UniProtKB/Swiss-Prot annotation:
This protein's encoding gene: bioB2
CDD domains: Radical_SAM
One Pfam family from the record: Radical_SAM
Designated name of the protein: Biotin synthase 2
Every Radical SAM core domain range: 53-280
Record has Iron as a keyword: yes
Protein source organism: Frankia casuarinae (strain DSM 45818 / CECT 9043 / HFP020203 / CcI3)
Length: 360
């Protein structure tokens, strides 16, 4: 089957609810650069069908940073990391709520509360419950997602009772590869936590990290594992190779392949909220706006230990690509018109007619 027929088949199956084949998913990942826009256009047909032109903004709040006992090889907060990240213990509920409020003011519809560590103690869950309460009191309509690691019995239910709407725990990579990136817990531990969250009434959120040296087959494996797990939202991260981590020298991606990965995830999980997540700025670069034709969600602002694109630049990007921000009273185009990130014309003061070198 040629690629055009494969893409038509993927769209048809995405509409009818039929699962694609592994060969079809692999064909997307292995397609040529000449076919990239065809791949994106086909993925957009599913994105538009299920999500229109809306973009959901999510905002991360790192409640506790660094000093994690787990050895996840991609993570700047891992055991033994000498990356110069911020390290601090639990934020007070009012501090976390104030930080969340800034993201909500910037357009975020969901706040993601994250804490480093293997998993929370019951006292930690109490702390997070207080933080959820503080956020919900100030912003009753905002969604709150918790991401605290592996959960013990009853903790998911406690978070749900406190007002949490969702729980994130990423699969990250294929089950057969998981031991290559982490030895202190297992792939099945992660699956169990996502299922525990679902059983407690929390919306499950689980995604991947691409660029860790995995094969195309590994990427397809984890995409189909997510289809089976059926999370409501799927964050797609691209490895940020932090110096001081075992994967600090891994630069395996380019913008075109990132778009193909996003499209493959969309084809395999057509009705899920696919979120463009960590690493988008450094790996997609100027092709970020094109990714909005595949994904329907992004993180606004900074990540847990690294800086992201400026929030007003995110709004500008969404507006210029012709999309709207979900949940706002006005769309991103109107926000741009009101001056969000609007730049004045810069008068040339270099090159010909000056003593300064030209911009070349």
């Amino acid at each position: 089957m040629d690629l055009s027929a494969t893409l038509n088949s993927l769209v048809s199956k995405g509409v009818s609810g039929q699962a694609p084949t592994r060969d079809e998913a692999l064909a997307v990942l292995r397609s040529d650069d000449d076919d990239l826009l065809d791949v994106v256009a086909a993925a957009y047909r599913l994105r538009r069908r299920y999500f229109g032109r809306r973009v959901k903004l999510n905002f991360l709040v790192n409640l506790k940073s660094g000093l994690c006992p787990e050895d996840c090889s991609y993570c700047s907060q891992r055991l033994g990391s000498n990356t110069g990240i911020l390290k601090y213990t639990w934020l007070k509920p009012e501090e976390a709520a104030a930080t969340a409020g800034a993201g909500i003011s910037g357009g975020a519809r969901r706040v993601c509360l994250v804490a480093s560590g293997r998993g929370p103690t019951d006292r930690d869950v109490d702390r997070v419950a207080d933080t959820i309460g503080a956020i919900k009191t100030a912003h009753p309509d905002v969604e709150v997602c918790a991401c605290l690691g592996l959960l013990s019995d009853g903790q998911a239910a406690q978070l749900r009772a406190a007002g949490a709407d969702a729980y994130n725990h990423n699969l990250n990579t294929a089950g057969e590869k998981y031991a290559d990136i982490c030895t202190t817990h297992t792939y099945n531990d992660r699956v169990d936590t996502v299922q525990e969250a679902r059983h407690a009434g929390l919306s499950p959120c689980s995604g991947i990290i691409a660029g860790m040296g995995e094969s195309d087959e590994d990427l397809v494996d984890v995409a189909f594992a997510l289809r089976e797990l059926a999370p409501d939202s799927i964050p797609v991260n691209f490895l940020m190779p932090f110096e001081g981590t075992p994967l600090g020298a891994e630069w395996n991606l380019n913008p075109r392949q990132c778009l193909r990965i996003l499209a493959m995830v969309r084809f395999v999980n057509p009705t899920a909220e696919v979120r463009l997540s960590g690493g988008r700025e450094i790996h997609l670069g100027s092709m970020q706006p094109l990714a909005l034709s595949v994904v329907n969600s992004i993180f606004l602002g900074d990540y847990l230990t690294s800086e992201g694109q400026e929030g007003h630049q995110d709004l500008k990007m969404i507006a210029e690509a012709g999309f709207t921000v979900e949940g706002l009273n006005t769309d991103a185009e109107a926000a741009l018109a009101m001056g969000a990130g609007l730049e004045r014309v810069a008068l040339r003061q270099r090159g010909a007619g000056t003593d300064l070198p030209p911009n070349a």
